[in-house]
Every structure is written in structure tokens, then in C-alpha cells.
Amino acid sequence: MLFRSVYRSSNAAISNWWNHLNTVLLALISNKEVAIDKAELMVTTPFTGISLPNGLYLNYPDLVRTTSGDFSYQTRTGRNKIYGGKVAENLCQAVARCIIGEQMINIEKRYRVVLTVHDAIACVVPVDEADEARSYIEECMRTPPKWAVGLPLNCESGMAQTYGDC
């Protein structure tokens, strides 16, 4: 408990956002619209979920608040507990997925994407275009989507005959 208190007092902005996300869970239950972020790129949408910047939604099916004040939602395997910190994690992962999805679309304009692993994209490129392909792919991965102008993105890349050798 001491570690948690020290972390929260040392990182008040994060702790405040987690608390805000608990109010977002209440808004979802009440079917009210609430902004997730100051730029209002993400908002709760009544009867739908949290709208993400690219138009997709993050949903918590059958979200309820228990008598003890906890939140839970239905999954295929039962009910899962959810809370502000977990919503923050889900939002970060969802936005990262939106970004890498747009990056893959841009890369696909020139090179075939054959695999993604978390935040990594693997492509098959002609050997004689390897350096040019690397530059193009890095440029695509460093370019934020239109809805995230100014977001600092960076990447590292490697080239090899097999994915395991990168």
C-alpha cells in the first residue's frame, strides 16, 4: 500500500486521469457523453462505448457497478473487473493499434506486410530495394495519423532474410 500511495502522490496527473476514467465508466453505464481527453479525440458515446480517434469503439459489454462500488463487464468467459487504471491501459493499447493500422495501410501502398507482432511490422521486399524500402517503412512508421498531428513517433528497423534474424 505504501508503494501505491507514493506512486500516486508522485504522479498526480496519472492518478487524476485514472479517477477521471472511473467517472467515464459511470458515464458509460448512464449512457452519457463525456470527453476522455482534453482534445476530445475520444468520448463516450451513449449505447455504443468509447469512440476512438479513427472511428472504432472500445466497448465494455453489460458494464455494471456492483454494490461495493467496483465495475465489471461481461466477456465470453465470465465477468471481468474494470477500473480507471485498466481503462487507461486499454485506451493506450487501442490508440496504438489504430496508429499501427494506419501505418500498415501506408506501408502496403508499396510493400507487402506479412506479419505484425505488438508494435512491429514485418514486410517482404525485393533485395535490390532493401535500403529504399527501409527508408520508406521508417518514414511511414514515424508519420502520425491526421488525427494525431504532432504526436512524436519513432521506430527502429532491421533487415534480414528471416524474421528471426532481425
Model-derived segments and their meaning:
Residues M1-C166:
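Conserved catalytic core of nucleotide polymerization and phosphodiester-bond processing enzymes
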